[in-house]
Amino acid sequence: MRQLTDHIVSADQAVQLEITVSDEPGAGGANHRYHIDWLGDTVWENAIPNSLDIHFQEGPIKEAGINGVTQEALLAIVIDRLRSFQAGPFSCRDNAVALTHCEEALMWLHRRTMARIKRGVEGTNRK
């Protein structure tokens, strides 16, 4: 298993989320299973479980069916949250720039999908 630390701000001394990659890379070179733990001594009212598993799509949808989430789905969630912060009292330049880059990332992934559809290879392991 491999730990991810890209989400940690080096100057932040607070308890951090622990992200673990819990599988081997697939045919495309990317992993599919991630586990997130958050630890803490305080049990909050209405608390949710202190871990989350994220399972990404394994294999082309046309061949394997839908069996996990996509980068696009997770980016859409992050974009929604950033748009909400920008519409509320926590609007700031940093959030605006982050939002723009997330929207741009989603646009490039959509562009890739559209090009694959045009070539007739979307949903397959073909280039």
Each language-model region and where it sits:
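Short, charged/polar N-terminal "headpieces" of proteins
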Residues: M1-D41
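Proteins with a high burden of low-complexity, intrinsically disordered sequence enriched in S/T/G/P/A and R
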Residues: A11-A14, G68, E72, R93-A96, ...
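A short, structured beta-strand/loop element
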Residues: A30-F85
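Charge-rich, acidic-biased intrinsically disordered regions
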Residues: R119-K127
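Homeobox/homeodomain signature
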Residues: G26, W44-N46, V97-A98
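Glutamate identity and glutamate-enriched acidic tracts
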Residues: E18, E24, E45, E58, ...
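Histidine (H) residue identity feature
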Residues: H7, H32-H35, H55, H101, ...
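Short, compact, well-ordered microdomains
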Residues: D80, F85-G120
